[in-house]
Amino acid sequence: MLPKLNDYNDLLVKLDYEMKQLNESDNIYDLLNCLLTLNSLPEWIKNSKTASEELKKIALEKEKIMKGENGFSLDEKLLFDDINHQLRFVRLVCNHTKHKTDSKQIPIIESI
């Protein structure tokens, strides 16, 4: 039986599974899986039939931050302390995996 991904709650279950995998493996592929799932959460919430209007509003605001709209830009100094900068970082990493560019705005992740 395949798991179903019908709404954002199912996506949260998927993220929980991926986080456990990451904690066990400490693997870059598992990290990327987590980031890709995190990247899609605001859109899933925004389009959900079960999410409250308040949650949808928050998701829309976070999605705009992630996309760099309204002049929001990533400040690496705030990355560990500010959720908005963390979300922007997630979006940049995910877009870089889909659309390889030489942009200086795309973070470089190196495995150690």
Tell me what each language-model feature is:
Residues 1-32, 53-112:
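Acidic, Ser/Thr/Gly/Pro-rich intrinsically disordered interaction regions
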Residues 39-52, 100:
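Extended, well-ordered alpha-helical segments in internal regulatory regions
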Residues 32-39:
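Amphipathic alpha-helical protein-interaction segments enriched in hydrophobic
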